[in-house]
Amino acid sequence: MGNPNCGKTTLFNGLTSSHQTVGNWPGVTVERIVGEFTYKDREITIVDLPGIYSLQPSSASSEDERVARDYILQDEAELIVNIVDASNLERNLYLTTQLLEMQVPMIVVLNMLDMAAAHQIEIDPHKLSEALGCPVIGIVAAKEQGLKELCAAIDAQLDDLRIPKNPIVFADDVEAARA
């Protein structure tokens, strides 16, 4: 799950050896696509969802956005793999924070680390993991770099599904209203 054009389908293809259409524009993936891969004798089913910016419905939401939102909100996933574009982290983390608030087992995947580096953007996955309260794995899906580490992280999470500690802190008045 992630924003449009963050490399979800490229990662899906790399993990499943599929050949789903990849494009640099929104709306390429318009339905959920199911695939499988094996890691250490474990069959893992993954779902490639259309890109969304938010879990909030809006009148401008397209059908593909509803497909992704409904899949997550209907609690169909055992583990969320949230793919984010490392070169545009701030925009991508809006969806990440919404997923963290849902208190679901999650891994954040920093994709396109090569593009981030080309723009002199440095991200420490360990520090980001500590801040978010869930595993963060850095990859370059287009070059299949980091996929072994990601598979190991998925396998470990599936062995011991952990809810991320909620690191999101609101202003005091908002926290009081939430209580």
PLM-predicted stretches and their roles:
Residues M1-P57, L73-D75, L79, E101:
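Conserved G1/Walker A P-loop phosphate-binding module
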Residues G27, G51-S54, A86-E90, M112-A117, ...:
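Conserved nucleotide-binding/hydrolysis micro-motifs of P-loop NTPases
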Residues V169-A179:
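Extracytoplasmic
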